[in-house]
């Protein structure tokens, strides 16, 4: 994390990762499925997960390549701009499948759920979870860094929406995907056909919930943020 273009501190993170860490701290059984390099950064992340009660048994720990790193640059309003660096092996996401039961919750999203190199295995896992009658929660978390790929990735985005029992995303996510920020238009034009349950977060303007029975707006309490990193993940 950088403030005034100077490194401030480094911590493990990522959208779904942050959500599971919060659940682990609350004592909720949580398993993280992803890929991590067999290196110092990877060791730090695994140790952090264990200390926060998140299961690491289903990680793919690879030897050829390096654990990915994200840089977050905070502006004067503590809003974050991101840059990503990675070096993955040719063969990806060779994880041990977890036990999935009815009403378990599967959270998936971000570019990880759209990446062509991982797409087949992500779909296999989500389809298996649906067969087991798990609840599928999709958080697009579609950042500015991938906005130029929106058209190319759209078939996978729409397929993810169709998988989902609940879609949650920020107005910024959907602006990057569909060039729309109005929650009603996002739901009516882009979400409802695929998934009836939708939550749109609007930062300081609150949260809008849509479902088959109607919609409702929830106001937020004004705060001065320390930073916006992981705000949506905390909402999850």
Where are the predicted features?
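Conserved phosphate-binding/catalytic region of the ribokinase-like
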Residues: 127, 183-236
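Short, conserved phosphate/pyrophosphate- and ester-handling motifs at nucleotide-, phospho-/glycolipid
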Residues: 23, 170, 232
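Conserved beta-alpha-beta core of the PfkB/ribokinase-like small-molecule kinase fold
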Residues: 111-188, 196, 206-207
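Hydrophobic anchor at the start of a short beta-strand
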Residues: 30, 56, 134-136, 198, ...
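Residues that scaffold the ATP/ADP-binding catalytic core of kinase and kinase-like folds
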Residues: 4, 83, 104, 177, ...
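Glycine-rich phosphate/adenosyl-contacting loop at the front of the ribokinase-like
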Residues: 1-55, 224-226
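A short, aliphatic-rich alpha-helical micro-motif
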Residues: 99-101, 160-161, 192
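Conserved N-terminal subdomain of the carbohydrate kinase-like
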Residues: 29-110
């Amino acid at each position: 994390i950088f403030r005034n273009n100077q490194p401030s501190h480094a911590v493990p993170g990522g959208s779904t990762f942050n959500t599971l860490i919060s659940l682990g701290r609350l004592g909720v059984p949580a398993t993280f499925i992803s890929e991590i390099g067999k290196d110092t950064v990877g060791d730090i992340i695994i140790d952090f997960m264990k200390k926060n009660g998140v299961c690491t048994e289903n990680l793919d720990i690879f030897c050829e390549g390096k654990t990915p790193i994200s840089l977050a640059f905070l502006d004067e309003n503590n809003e974050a701009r991101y840059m990503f660096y990675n070096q993955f092996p040719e063969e990806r996401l060779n994880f041990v499948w977890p036990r999935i039961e009815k009403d378990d919750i599967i959270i998936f999203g971000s570019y990880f759920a759209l990446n062509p190199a991982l797409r087949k295995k992500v779909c296999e896992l989500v389809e298996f979870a649906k067969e087991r009658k798990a609840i599928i929660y999709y958080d697009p978390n579609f950042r500015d860094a991938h906005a130029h790929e929106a058209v190319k990735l759209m078939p996978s985005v729409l397929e993810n929406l169709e998988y989902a029992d609940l879609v949650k995303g920020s107005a910024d996510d959907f602006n990057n995907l569909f060039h729309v920020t109005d929650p009603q238009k996002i739901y009516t034009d882009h979400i409802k056909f695929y998934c009836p349950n939708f939550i749109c977060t609007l930062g300081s303007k609150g949260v809008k919930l849509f479902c088959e029975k109607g919609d409702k707006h929830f106001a937020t309490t004004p705060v001065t943020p320390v930073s916006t990193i992981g705000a949506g993940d905390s909402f999850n």
